[in-house]
């Protein structure tokens, strides 16, 4: 599920970056700085997803109920932390972008990519990774149920 969210984040960011470059909004090219931007996005996205998944893991033994309810409560518990860290990161990267916009240097593209990546990563850690986890877990449980039924026959 985390890999699904990670691929989502990278592809959406890459798409926005391609649109911005094509429309001459920013200057960016494949360079070490752009690779660093995507590695930053990957790290940020994984960290956010791990925080949510860790809370789900902590809540599963403590809470009774459907997995969907546990996931929902876990997202609600981590929501403030996720939003605060995202806003803090966005503020600093937005300042970096504002200071470099129009300069046509590598930091302009870096800041733009990280801004898009942080926004998309924050969204996906809650609304892509968690539903994907639920879907994968339900499939796993259904397969385990089918295997038990086949064994009993």
Kindly label every feature range from the protein language model.
Residues 5, 9, 41-44, 48, ...:
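Membrane-embedded alpha-helical bundles that form the substrate/pore pathway
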Residues 131-153:
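Interfacial helix-loop-helix hairpins and adjacent transmembrane helices
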């Amino acid at each position: 599920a985390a890999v699904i969210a990670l691929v989502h984040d990278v592809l959406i960011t890459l798409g926005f970056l391609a649109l911005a470059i094509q429309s001459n909004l920013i200057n960016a090219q494949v360079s070490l700085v752009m690779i660093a931007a995507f590695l930053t996005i990957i790290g940020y996205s994984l960290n956010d997803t791990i925080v949510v998944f860790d809370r789900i893991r902590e809540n599963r033994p403590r809470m009774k109920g459907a997995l969907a309810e546990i996931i929902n409560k876990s997202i609600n518990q981590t929501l403030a932390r996720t939003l605060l860290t995202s806003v803090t990161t966005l503020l600093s990267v937005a300042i970096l972008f504002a200071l470099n916009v129009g300069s046509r240097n590598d930091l302009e593209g870096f800041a733009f990519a990280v801004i898009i990546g942080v926004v998309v990563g924050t969204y996906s850690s809650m609304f892509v990774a968690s539903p994907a986890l639920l879907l994968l877990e339900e499939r796993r449980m259904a397969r385990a149920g089918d295997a038990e039924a086949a064994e009993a026959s």
